[in-house]
């Protein structure tokens, strides 16, 4: 993550001064894995408000949908992954309404 932030800073400095990070999204989150929780805590500690509150869980249906040539909403709109992406979309829109 630190390397990615560094790369974004370099691109911003040399190529696109208007570039900014809209937010950090935690995905493939495995609720059963303690390391996942520790990493999430560290990310929230360092990046605080930049971290989206919505977390995309590890979900079999999410991994299956591309092989069927469908979005997750088309494939299984009621699975946990689809619901999380809908929630993320709403969170993204709320954030952007506040900044406009």
Model-derived regions: residue spans:
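Hydrophobic "lid"/C-terminal helical patch
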Residues: 88-92
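Generic C-terminal helix-cap and adjacent flexible tail
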Residues: 93-100
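Nucleotide phosphate-binding site architecture
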Residues: 57, 63, 73
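C-terminal boundary of histidine-terminating zinc-finger modules
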Residues: 66-87
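Conserved catalytic-core segment of NTP-binding enzymes
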Residues: 1-60
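Generic signal for short, ordered secondary-structure residues
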Residues: 22, 64-67
């Amino acid at each position: 993550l630190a390397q990615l932030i560094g790369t974004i800073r370099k691109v911003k400095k040399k190529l696109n001064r208007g570039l900014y990070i809209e937010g950090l999204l935690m995905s493939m989150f495995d609720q059963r894995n303690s390391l996942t929780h520790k990493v999430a805590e560290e990310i929230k500690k360092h990046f605080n408000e930049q971290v989206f509150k919505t977390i995309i869980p590890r979900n079999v249906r999410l991994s299956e949908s591309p092989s069927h040539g469908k979005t997750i909403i088309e494939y299984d709109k009621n699975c946990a992954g689809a619901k999380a992406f809908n929630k993320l979309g709403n969170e993204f829109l709320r954030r952007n309404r506040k900044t406009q």
